[in-house]
Amino acid sequence: MITITFNGAINSDNIDLYQDIFSGEVQNPNGCQIKGSFFVSHKYTNYSAVQELHRRGHELAVFSVTNKDDPEYWTGGSYDDWLAEMAGSRLIIERFANVSDGSVIGIRAPYLRVGGNKQFEMMADQYFVYDSSITAPLSRVPIWPYTLYYRMPHKCHGNAQNCPSRSHPVWEMVINELDRRDDPFYDESQSGCQLVSSCSNIVDPDQFARMLRHNFQRHLDSNRAPLGLHFNAVWLKENKGFKKELIKFIADMLDRNDVYFVTMLQVSIFPVAA
């Protein structure tokens, strides 16, 4: 399984990008169209475009109301801060994009700055199913999504992160760091990267294509944990060669006939269904 996610506002600046990537002609082996997950922030969002993505079967999740430009605000946020930002964002999406099916159940924190127990207490109280803000450091074996009923199966990764320390009835759709090394066998100086756009050493389309295929193979050859490709739309819009390689990668993976591009929600259901 591969997930493609985007963070931020949805509007006329990027809706054409999403239409190019998720064209109706691209289908999973079961004949269903490939889907993405969109973590929506309120500011600058066109809710008609959000409604259209939902109509096409893509997943909508929340990325906050304010998208406040202060990482410490998210790390140290109170219960009420998280309630206003995330539950408030869901209410806005449901009202202005006319989403009435209860499908907005996921959260991603701006800057991937986890809000500790307060964030997850709010999530449980408001019936959010999953968070996708915690990063697992690059390791030999990637991490499958897990529940926070138990201790995290990896260290709390990142400077000044505020990971939960108590049990919570919430799924963590963990972000496995991508291996961005040109030569994974010899180049040990490069750390992993959380978002594709944060892989700063990837400067040309050929590098990007190699990175995508290497990380897919790394997940396939180890424990087949879902491969998450997490993007900022501006980064792809500004690098048209990268968009072309992403579309080619999707086509090549689907040609295998054993790879599915799914939403975060579908991944969270998979262990239960299996």
Question: Where are each of the predicted segments found?
Answer:
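His/Asp/Glu-enriched short active-site or ligand-binding loop at hydrolase and phosphoryl-transfer sites
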Residues: 65-69, 125-150, 175-180, 195, ...
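Active-site beta->alpha N-cap acidic-glycine motif
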Residues: 1-59, 66-70, 90-95, 99-121, ...
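Alpha-helical scaffold elements lining the catalytic groove of polysaccharide deacetylases
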Residues: 14-16, 67-98, 148-221
